[in-house]
């Protein structure tokens, strides 16, 4: 069965969501393998527009399913809001999404830390402020939370206490959300995920499923924002290229095709090198016509 990866070939915002949405009619599974809510993928159903930051760009009107892999950093509150929007028009669609329990959680502390770090930098990198960098940092430093921790209240409290005190010591300040408030917040999100009937399934189990069916791997951002191959340090913190499918247990050698998406003109969000930047009224016209805001 066919395995296809769709990735951005510029700085993101190339229209990957539309491409994925178009091809989704031919694939049973749409898989996000990296990134977080700093990505924005637009899909259309008829004349109605949906913008997802975390959810894979499945086609709501056919029986395709979505999987969020372990390489992602997930703002669970944002995820639930996206599910609720789709549920209004497509009741029961949440049960067609599957989460890897090994995926990392973006906490409100990460967002606060993101903005704090940007203020401290001599040269700002243009962060989106969504906590992506600090979340990936905690993941690499083994200091954060994965989704499976939500189902163990004792472990959840222990981890939150450890994370909070580590950050308080690091920045010599208290954070806006207390440990108790964070605990209540996360327990509420867990209950909401259960109410929406979202599935939790490991990549090991999903790999067996994916081997025997058609899968479209949906990339986030673009190659020039990739942590290893982008315009460092003005990059994102995750894998933007096809090699990121390894977080779902796949090798690039198992892919039948990799499609790189471009648009006729180039845009980028935030700071960093942009050799073809057009600062005249022509650039303004392109922004206006292309709705690049």
Regions found by a protein language model. Give the residues of each.
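Non-transmembrane, aqueous-exposed alpha-helical and coiled segments at domain scale
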Residues: 1-293
